[in-house]
């Protein structure tokens, strides 16, 4: 039996070198998930997901990876779909409880911390397992866009631009080179799609992409219609076609 086997099976026991293996395995589930992207712009915040449909028999509309949490908050998920759905439902309840209790919209950071607190409890009690999903939570409060990432351990980080899922490294590489804090929502969408294009090695189209935005102007979350997504995708495809022709 391998030396780490006992620590491998127990969620509540640290290994001698300070690791919780089940939490690490939950992170691996996220790394194998679809690529989700979040970008803060000067006038809002953007979420994009490549739904990575594996069969032409699947109805693309039945796969949802971007969700509305409240009027001004959206979330993108990667990892185990059922786990993500449970966390999204919990976040929606928290948002409604805050609205009823205090007669005001919940803060983006507040809802992110509540979800992280819940995820953290599933790393320290027996008889449960960590959530095998990560969330990008995006919204607008205090007259500025916010973007947070929650991981299976319950850790919380705020980003200007980031990604989760299988294509994370490729996407972050693009962001580090091309992200600008003063870009608008349209430019952020194009940057996100360009990063997803490179992460997917050009294997994407409007039918596999989901895009959500929260504008600083109206503080409303909305998902782009397929026609809008298609227009952005066409711009990206034309851009890369021109680049290939020049080469």
Curated annotation (Swiss-Prot):
Q: Which GO terms describe its biological process?
A: proteasomal protein catabolic process; ubiquitin-dependent protein catabolic process
List the GO terms this entry assigns under cellular component, sorted alphabetically. Answer: cytoplasm; proteasome core complex, alpha-subunit complex
Family membership noted in the UniProt record: Belongs to the peptidase T1A family.
Family matches, as PROSITE patterns = PROTEASOME_ALPHA_1 (PS00388), PROTEASOME_ALPHA_2 (PS51475)
Indicate where this protein is primarily found. cytoplasm
* Activity regulation remarks: The formation of the proteasomal ATPase PAN-20S proteasome complex, via the docking of the C-termini of PAN into the intersubunit pockets in the alpha-rings, triggers opening of the gate for substrate entry. Interconversion between the open-gate and close-gate conformations leads to a dynamic regulation of the 20S proteasome proteolysis activity.
Keyword Methyltransferase recorded: no
**A molecular-function term among this protein's GO annotations:** threonine-type endopeptidase activity
Q: Which organism is it from?
A: Methanosarcina thermophila
Q: Which UniProt keywords apply?
A: Cytoplasm, Proteasome
> What name goes with this protein?
Proteasome subunit alpha
Subcellular location, record wording: Cytoplasm
Q: Does the keyword Cytoplasm apply?
A: yes
Described by its record, this protein's role is as follows: Component of the proteasome core, a large protease complex with broad specificity involved in protein degradation.
Record note on quaternary structure? The 20S proteasome core is composed of 14 alpha and 14 beta subunits that assemble into four stacked heptameric rings, resulting in a barrel-shaped structure. The two inner rings, each composed of seven catalytic beta subunits, are sandwiched by two outer rings, each composed of seven alpha subunits. The catalytic chamber with the active sites is on the inside of the barrel. Has a gated structure, the ends of the cylinder being occluded by the N-termini of the alpha-subunits. Is capped at one or both ends by the proteasome regulatory ATPase, PAN.
Q: Which domain of life is it from?
A: Archaea
């Amino acid at each position: 039996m391998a030396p780490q086997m006992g620590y491998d099976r127990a969620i509540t026991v640290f290994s001698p070198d300070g690791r919780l293996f089940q939490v690490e395995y939950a992170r691996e589930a996220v790394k194998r998930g679809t690529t989700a992207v979040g970008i803060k712009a000067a006038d809002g915040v953007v979420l994009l997901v490549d739904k990575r449909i594996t069969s032409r028999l699947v109805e693309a509309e039945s796969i949802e990876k971007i969700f509305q949490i409240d009027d001004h908050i959206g979330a993108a998920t990667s990892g185990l779909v059922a786990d993500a759905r449970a966390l999204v439902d919990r976040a929606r309840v928290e948002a409604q409880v805050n609205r009823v209790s205090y007669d005001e919209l919940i803060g983006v950071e507040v809802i992110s911390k509540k979800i992280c607190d819940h995820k953290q409890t599933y790393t320290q009690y027996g008889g449960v397992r960590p959530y095998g999903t990560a969330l990008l939570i995006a919204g607008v409060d205090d007259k500025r866009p916010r973007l947070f990432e929650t991981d299976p351990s319950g850790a919380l980080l705020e980003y200007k631009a980031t990604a989760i899922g299988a294509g994370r490294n490729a996407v972050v590489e693009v962001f580090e080179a091309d992200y600008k804090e003063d870009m608008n929502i349209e430019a952020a969408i194009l940057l996100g799609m360009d990063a997803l294009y490179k992460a997917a090695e050009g294997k994407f189209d409007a039918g596999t992409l989901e895009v959500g935005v929260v504008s600083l102007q109206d503080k409303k979350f909305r998902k782009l219609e397929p026609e809008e997504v298609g227009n952005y995708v066409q711009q990206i495809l034309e851009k890369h076609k021109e680049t290939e022709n020049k080469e």
